[in-house]
């Protein structure tokens, strides 16, 4: 068993930080991939506006996610912080108020607020007491303050997308990424 003893001696002589570095590298790669996959899915599948336009700008969804990477300083796990609050419609772009002159499903009476491809019926832009500008709309059923900010709900889609993306990536990709990372660390160690 001369070869086995030689292999054990070689493995023991390797840098003891090699495996932790490889695992940190793989964890960070998986976290970045989870953020990318989930934000693209949410941006592609979210429906906004009264005309039910599918899709949001990817930049708006990506701004709501922050990745804290794993490091060699003892923090061996990556953390993803997600702002799951609703997205105000004013963030979608420059707004135009149009009076509707045509007949149609959405353009039948009153004014229509158009922000990019998204239409919001009976909406208007107003500066709030805190100084921010928002798209507002009259809301039925609210007694005291019958107007409300127009928002696009993102809580459900973001939660679902991140849970499914992280679970599938951990099951399928993590072993491959760990293998790649260990090979890379070994190559770096042997090339010294």
Predicted regions and their residues:
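Short, Lys/Arg-rich flexible segments
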Residues: 1-192
